[in-house]
Each structure stands twice: as structure tokens, then as C-alpha cells.
Curated annotation (Swiss-Prot):
<keyword id="KW-0472">Membrane</keyword>
<keyword id="KW-1003">Cell membrane</keyword>
<dbReference type="InterPro" id="IPR050445">
    <property type="entry name" value="Bact_polysacc_biosynth/exp"/>
</dbReference>
<dbReference type="InterPro" id="IPR003856">
    <property type="entry name" value="LPS_length_determ_N_term"/>
</dbReference>
<comment type="similarity">
    <text>Belongs to the CpsC/CapA family.</text>
</comment>
<keyword id="KW-0270">Exopolysaccharide synthesis</keyword>
<comment type="pathway">
    <text>Capsule biogenesis; capsule polysaccharide biosynthesis.</text>
</comment>
<feature type="transmembrane region" description="Helical">
    <location>
        <begin position="25"/>
        <end position="45"/>
    </location>
</feature>
<dbReference type="Pfam" id="PF02706">
    <property type="entry name" value="Wzz"/>
</dbReference>
<dbReference type="GO" id="GO:0045227">
    <property type="term" value="P:capsule polysaccharide biosynthetic process"/>
</dbReference>
<keyword id="KW-0812">Transmembrane</keyword>
<protein>
    <recommendedName>
        <fullName>Capsular polysaccharide biosynthesis protein CpsC</fullName>
    </recommendedName>
</protein>
<dbReference type="GO" id="GO:0004713">
    <property type="term" value="F:protein tyrosine kinase activity"/>
</dbReference>
<keyword id="KW-0972">Capsule biogenesis/degradation</keyword>
<comment type="function">
    <text>Required for CpsD phosphorylation. Involved in the regulation of capsular polysaccharide biosynthesis. May be part of a complex that directs the coordinated polymerization and export to the cell surface of the capsular polysaccharide.</text>
</comment>
<keyword id="KW-1133">Transmembrane helix</keyword>
<feature type="transmembrane region" description="Helical">
    <location>
        <begin position="181"/>
        <end position="201"/>
    </location>
</feature>
Amino acid sequence: MNKIANTEVEINIFNLLKKLWKKKFLITFVAIAFATAGLFYSLFIVTPQYTSSTRIYVINPNTPNNSITAQDLQAGSFLANDYKEIITSTDVLEKVISSEKLNYPSSQLLQKITVSILKDTRVISISVEDANPKMSQKLANSVREAAVSKIKAVTQVEDITTLEKGNLPKAPSSPNIKKNVLIGFIVGAGLSTIVLVIMGILDDRVNTEEDIEKALGLTSLGIVPDLNKL
């Protein structure tokens, strides 16, 4: 009994795959349509964003003569997480807003800032994203300056070195056009396939001789040909 059921499932899956193959041009059309929508969205709807990055290097205040050991490096990496919180603190953000005369709240500025710590180092990268490339550079440097001042005040660290000042981005960092087009293509192909599969599963029409035998539980004696096709 289970063998018969498994055979029926295999036949149904095979028939379903055949139906999908017959609809391959429709699936491709929908996928291309969604990919085109992703391209249109990336080019004409989303505002391009530019990212400027600056990096600082922080010395552990408890390190004598600025000598660095493996233990100091590990401790410094943990302290870097504290510095990350300081950089994104409200005091730092408000100072940047005041110095740059920004007309939006600190919460909005925070969304533009990304702080990352290079693994097993004391190097902290501060990136700022903005629709204006010059503004992204200006904000990155302003955040760095305000953050350095705050870190010194809170941790009593005096040795903070600027490794890189904020660069002037020449190309937008987002949107990622290729990624959006690819996502659109995959989503379009996936959605159209799912819809066709559901339609195939719900389709209980009798289309073949085998369907008639299953529906009536009788053996077919023959097929009456369509005279119009002879």
C-alpha cells in the first residue's frame, strides 16, 4: 500500500515538474520583471549614499612606556568595546550636531554612524553615511574629534592616534545595484514558481487517462480520438 502511495506521489511530483517546465517562459518573464523593478528602484527611487571612514588607535592607559604585550593587546581589544559605546553616546552625537549645525536629532545621526573594531587590535573604524559625499567626510571627522575628546575625558587616555582622516568618497556605497537586481530576479522566480506549484496542487481537473482511472477506480478500455485532430 505504501509502495503505491509513494508511486503516486512520485508521479504527482513528476507531473508538477512537467507543468513547471511548460511554464518556464512565464517564470523567466516574471523573474526578469522583478529584476527590472529592482533596477528601477535602485536607480530612480533610492537616494545614493556615500560613506566616509576614519580610523583611530587607542593605547591602554595602564601600559607602561607604551610597550605592547599580547596581554595588553587583548585587554585593549576589550576596552575598544567601551570606546565604541562612548563614540555613539548622546554627548558625542549632540556635540557633533552643535558643531556642524545639523537640523536633525541625535537618533538620526546615530543611524548614519557605524563603529567597528578590527579583530585583536585597538584600531577603531568610524564610518558615516550621507547622501552628500562632502558631508559624510565632514561628519566622519567631526565624530572622530568629538569621540577622541570624550574618550580622553572618560578613560583618562591621552595617547589616541588618528590613523586615517575621513576620506572623500567618489562613488556611492549604496544602493548595491547588482545585489538588488539579483534579489529581484530570485524573488520573482521564486514567487512565480510557488504560485504555479500551488495552482498545480489545487488543480483537480481530469486531464489524462490515468486521472480517469484514479477518479473512477475503473480500468480504461480505450480512448476515443478527437476527430478534429485527425
